[in-house]
Amino acid sequence: MKKKLFALLLAAALTVCAVPAQALTGEGSRAAQTLSALNVVRGAYNVNDPATRAQAAVILVRLAGAEQAAAADKTHIPFRDVPAYAVQSVRYAYGRGWLTGVTGDRFGASEAISTQSYCAALGRMLGYTTDDFSYENAVSFARHMALTSRDYGETLTRGDLFELTAGALYARYKDSGSTVLEHLCAVSP
């Protein structure tokens, strides 16, 4: 376990160090590099593009190390606007209460995800409930949990999404005390 964790951390550090400084366009790119080394982010980073709710669901499920579980999950979702690439992730995140729809029958998959919504989803993924924080104070709770120390706009760019996600790597799950990174390393093949 410790060897695997060390290897993943070393791979993440080497990946970031191997990229020339001028090729990185800020914290979002650095976070994307780290998450890519952990197989949480794949493909083009497009850090300045708006982050959609569908993209956030996919990243959240990967961060939880739950892609295989999501593939097996058959939870019914009432949403008809979820693209094929995100159906399993939305189903899984919705089934666990991490994300909700924007209406009863619409997920809002192509809409930009709000900072508040993603912070709430991260808190829920970590096992926190309405007894611990409310949707209204989700951003404050994320700061309290040290997921972020900076202010974001009302909606997130992909770079912002990557930064918040990378910030969650060292957050501890409420009930187990293990970090997201430790859990991710434990469930990674």
Question: What is the predicted function of each stretch?
Answer:
Residues K2-Q88, R96-T155, L169-P189:
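Feature responds to low-complexity, polar/acidic, surface-exposed segments characteristic
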